[in-house]
Design a protein with these regions (language model features):
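Charged, often glycine-rich, active-site loop that binds/positions anionic groups
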Residues: 55-61
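Acidic surface patches and DE-rich sequence motifs
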Residues: 52-53, 128
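Active-site-adjacent pocket-lining segments in enzyme domains
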Residues: 2-20, 30-47, 62-106, 110-206
């Protein structure tokens, strides 16, 4: 069983699966490093076997999903991949359990399709790649709650489309509360505008 090594750190689980879209979680994982010891980021897959990302990187998960104690998880992150139209039952069951207990879940691109498949978007405001993308999910009845935004947060569930990794990461940072808001704002300003003033603010806040 994988458990937290420090009682005050927050365990963030990034789901590792074949064809996971590298750009969708890159800003997120790098940005979490700014939180230092406040965050422990682990990758977890259906098994601990190596997966290949969409960009061709070989990732060996830190753990299998079965090795995790759901009570230890502070956030579950579901990246996009080419395979979300079916399967992934183990991680989707975990997502449903976490949502029921109030633990935040963050899904981007294909990950939102997974949430739609298990009903987690039926009553929450959400976004994705497009409304008809989520329409591929059997049983999805949440179309009235779809919002054409870069990222949406509602009732503990963060959703974003494939082209919004920055907004996705920002929403995760804010939900975790592991970084001061001025740091998040400076980080977001830097990567959306490239302006020096945000870099100076970010460095000055560290």
């Amino acid at each position: 069983m994988l458990t937290n090594t420090e009682s005050n750190e927050k365990l963030v689980v990034l789901y590792a699966t074949d064809t996971m879209a590298d750009w969708e979680y890159g800003y997120l994982t790098a940005g979490l490093g700014m939180a230092g010891g406040a965050i422990r980021l682990v990758t977890a897959g259906e098994t601990a076997a190596e997966v290949d990302t969409m960009g061709g990187l070989h990732v060996r998960p830190d753990a299998a999903l079965a090795d995790l104690d759901p009570d230890d998880i502070a956030m579950l992150v579901l990246p996009g991949a080419d395979t979300w139209a079916e399967g992934h039952e183990q991680v989707l069951a975990l997502a449903s359990r976490l949502a029921a207990s109030g633990t935040p879940i963050a899904a981007i691109c294909g990950g939102t399709l997974g949430l739609a498949r298990v009903g987690l978007l039926d009553e929450r405001r959400h976004t994705s790649n497009a409304p008809d993308f989520l329409g591929m999910a059997d049983g999805y009845v949440g179309a009235a709650h779809y919002s054409d935004e870069r990222a949406v947060v509602d009732d503990g569930v963060i959703t974003a489309g494939a082209t919004a990794p920055l907004e996705f990461a920002k929403a995760v940072f804010e939900a975790l509360g592991a970084l001061p808001q001025p740091v998040i704002d400076a980080w977001y300003g830097l990567y959306t505008t490239g302006e020096r003033r945000y870099f100076d603010a970010l460095v000055g806040a560290e």
